[in-house]
From Swiss-Prot:
Catalyzes the phosphorylation of the position 2 hydroxy group of 4-diphosphocytidyl-2C-methyl-D-erythritol. It catalyses: 4-CDP-2-C-methyl-D-erythritol + ATP = 4-CDP-2-C-methyl-D-erythritol 2-phosphate + ADP + H(+). It comes from the Bacteria. The keyword ATP-binding applies. The gene is ispE. It is an enzyme of class 2 (transferase). This is 4-diphosphocytidyl-2-C-methyl-D-erythritol kinase. Its EC number is 2.7.1.148. Belongs to the GHMP kinase family. IspE subfamily. Pathway: Isoprenoid biosynthesis; isopentenyl diphosphate biosynthesis via DXP pathway; isopentenyl diphosphate from 1-deoxy-D-xylulose 5-phosphate: step 3/6. It comes from Halorhodospira halophila (strain DSM 244 / SL1) (Ectothiorhodospira halophila (strain DSM 244 / SL1)).
Length: 288
């Protein structure tokens, strides 16, 4: 029987999120910066020859047919005509629906890894296109670099880690269940922020336009931001519920994590320019 292989599915945080307006198709025009982190879920894959896609792990509240990892594998089959199948096991370490890209990153990892394991030969552009049909955040994980994002977040430009900025992040999940649809549908949401440039980000002239809505409707997020604010400039990632604060070094971030209130969960992770997934892919290609 073919052996299992393990592939990383890294987290992301949104260093800012500006809502520029609403598009004719109902989606919102956004600007954001995706910062990839060196921590995330782990995806175990075992190719099979019968063409079946089987989920071997349980994700509470998500049927196998709706699981993004299963959908990603089947989307790759449909796009390439591959007869390959796969068993999928997800070691879930990122909070579901937390704004750190857990499900999107898992889907991207399945696409990238199976493209290698099944030898389907798609390039990055084609994989990103398949990913976009699964979710707006999937392409940034497929491309595997921290990036400046526009459109609905799918228009990407690689963005280096700021050498003068934070290198380590404490990410906190206060456990709130945020409805992204409710946030973007809120009448009080700011929808007319002016476009900015990367130098504006470096200067700190940024915010998360969704944060005031989430603060007012989900008090747990407001409490987490207040607590993190004691350690630096606290921000919310995406539409939450995860919030974060940056540190220059790992020791400072770990010290703050140790003081985390018991009702919350969190992790410390390093900012990375290149995804751990792509480093794993390069090693797999090198060793055959």
């Amino acid at each position: 029987m073919t052996e299992w292989s393990v592939w990383p599915a890294p987290a992301k945080i949104n260093l800012f999120l500006h809502v520029l307006g609403r598009r004719a198709d109902g989606y919102h025009e956004l600007q954001t910066a995706f910062q990839l982190l060196g921590y995330g879920d782990r995806i175990w894959l075992r190719p099979r020859v019968d063409g079946r896609v089987e989920r071997c792990s349980h994700l509470p509240g998500v049927a196998a047919e709706d699981d993004l990892t299963v959908r990603a594998a089947r989307a790759l089959q449909a796009a390439t005509g591959s007869a390959g199948g796969v068993d999928i096991h997800v070691d879930k370490r990122l909070p579901a629906g937390g704004g750190v890209g857990g499900g999107s990153s898992d889907a991207a990892t399945v696409l990238v890894a199976l493209n290698h394991l099944w030898q389907t030969g798609l390039d990055e552009e084609a994989l990103a296109g398949i990913g976009l049909a699964l979710g707006a955040d999937v392409p940034v994980f497929v491309r595997g670099r921290s990036a400046w994002g526009e459109g609905v977040g799918e228009q990407l430009r690689p963005m280096p880690v700021d050498p003068a900025g934070s290198r380590w992040y404490l990410v906190v999940d206060p456990g709130a269940s945020i409805s992204t649809a409710e946030v973007f549908g809120a009448p009080e949401l700011t929808r007319d922020t002016s476009p900015i440039t990367i130098p504006d980000l470096r200067a700190g002239a940024v915010r998360n336009d969704c944060e005031p809505v989430v603060r007012s409707r989900w008090p747990a997020v407001a409490e987490a931001l207040e607590w993190l604010g004691r350690h630096g400039q606290a921000r919310m990632s995406g539409t939450g519920s995860c919030c974060f604060v940056g540190f220059p070094g790992e020791a400072e971030a770990q010290a703050a994590l140790e003081r985390l209130p018991g009702a919350w969960s969190g992790f410390v992770a390093q900012a990375v320019e290149r995804s751990p997934l792509h480093l794993t892919l390069a090693e797999a290609a090198r060793t055959g």
